[in-house]
């Protein structure tokens, strides 16, 4: 099968990483993989793996740029004999939709998160099939954009178990610190103030606790606000803001507990399955896609999104009861192996491609039969 994925850019990020990994997997399995984007740091990794990349300004919203990109994409689709087009963002999806109409090549979309009820957002539901990363996204696509469930396919994000793997902390030859951490962009929805307020309570019970916050800040003032809050809570000596890091598996493996205290609806919660793969116990809020991953008191602990006291108590439970923490971590690891293994997600995606192509074949057969009858 010849597959073309289209997305705005190939810089670092979860969507970009998933695109590259899927393209490499398709290539390895004997399929043709083509990626169209405006370029970025990950292009070299693609081309080194034998994946064809075309640079187009598919991140620009200008109507003239969109028209140019539609024409160029049609030429690429024909040149590469593409069987299915897979769009992963709104402007690329708009371009892919018109190219699909002109070339009669099926087009599918992946909804990685929530979209505002903007007119442009409707395009994410125009795919012949619509892939969603969690049940809550699927529900939103139905309720907000009228996408029928019969066209929605649930494929959660996967995790590379060769990269995120069990690493016994004692075997790393380092002093074992008690570390509670968060990983994710420094944005209000992630619940960083809630986390810091909870950790101030934890620190009163465990004064030597260490806190690590890993992630970049799209808006610098917000990071400064969090640093000020940490100082006001008396956590300056305990907390580290580590920024963007590329050694996440190693850092995550050193955590005693991962906190995922989102205060808004998370589309999925990739860091939770990464923690599960590493055998790290998890405390998360009962929000959005997080409940698709964690079964309370089986795979981890779920808490309300508005109470630092309850969050602190949950973290302390896992720190003070290592047997319980390990039981939850082992259960989550098994779930990740069973439901979120990256190759399994890729195979499910390939099945969606095959379904989209087969629907086109059925339509062609029906039209041919109709023409014959006249």
Map each language-model feature to its residues.
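A conserved mid-protein helix/loop that constitutes part of the nucleotide-sugar donor-binding site
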Residues: 13-21, 182-204, 221-224, 309-310, ...
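Short hydrophobic beta-strand element within catalytic cores of glycosyltransferases
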Residues: 35, 281-284, 294
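Glycosyltransferase donor-sugar binding loop
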Residues: 35-41, 183, 210-224
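Acidic anion/phosphate-binding donor-loop and adjacent secondary structure
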Residues: 61-65, 139-144, 150-151, 158-175, ...
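A conserved, positively charged/aromatic
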Residues: 101-135, 139, 146-147
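Active-site donor-binding acidic/aromatic loop of nucleotide-activated sugar
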Residues: 219-225, 236-245, 251, 301-302
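Acidic donor-binding loop of glycosyltransferase active sites
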Residues: 238, 253-267, 280
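Conserved acidic donor-binding segment of nucleotide-sugar-dependent glycosyltransferases
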Residues: 296-297, 301-308, 317-323
């Amino acid at each position: 099968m010849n597959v073309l994925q289209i997305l705005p850019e190939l810089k670092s990020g979860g969507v970009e990483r998933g695109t590259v990994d899927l393209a490499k997997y398709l290539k390895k399995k004997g399929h043709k993989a083509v990626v169209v984007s405006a370029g970025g740091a990950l292009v070299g990794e693609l081309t080194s793996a034998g994946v064809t990349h075309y640079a187009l300004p598919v991140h620009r919203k200008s109507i003239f740029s969109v028209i140019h990109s539609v024409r160029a994409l049609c030429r690429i689709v024909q040149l590469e004999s593409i069987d299915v087009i897979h769009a992963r963002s709104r402007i690329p999806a708009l371009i892919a939709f018109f190219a699909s109409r002109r070339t009669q090549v099926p087009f599918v979309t992946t909804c990685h998160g929530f979209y505002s009820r903007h007119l442009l957002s409707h395009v994410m539901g125009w795919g012949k099939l619509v892939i969603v990363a969690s049940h809550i996204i699927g529900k939103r696509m139905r309720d907000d954009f009228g996408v029928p469930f019969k066209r929605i396919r649930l494929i959660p994000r996967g995790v590379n178990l060769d990269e995120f793997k069990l690493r016994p902390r004692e075997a790393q030859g380092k002093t074992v610190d008690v570390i509670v951490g968060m990983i994710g962009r420094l944005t209000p929805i992630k619940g960083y103030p809630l986390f810091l307020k909870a950790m101030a309570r934890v620190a009163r019970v465990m004064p030597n606790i260490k806190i690590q916050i890993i992630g970049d800040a799209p808006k610098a003032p917000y990071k400064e606000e969090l640093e000020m809050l940490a100082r006001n809570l008396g956590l300056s000596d305990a907390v580290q803001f580590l920024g963007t890091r590329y050694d996440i598996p190693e850092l995550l493996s050193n955590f005693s507990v991962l906190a995922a205290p989102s205060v808004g609806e998370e589309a999925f919660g990739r860091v939770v399955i990464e923690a599960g793969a590493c055998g790290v116990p998890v405390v998360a809020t009962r929000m959005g896609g997080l409940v698709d991953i964690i079964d309370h008191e089986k795979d981890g602990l779920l808490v309300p999104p508005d109470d630092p006291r309850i969050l602190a108590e949950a973290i302390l439970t896992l720190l003070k009861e290592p047997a319980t923490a390990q039981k939850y971590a082992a259960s989550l690891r098994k779930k990740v192996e069973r439901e979120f293994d990256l190759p399994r997600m890729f195979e499910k995606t390939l099945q969606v491609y095959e379904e989209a192509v087969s629907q086109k074949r059925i339509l062609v057969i029906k039209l041919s039969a109709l023409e014959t009858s006249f």
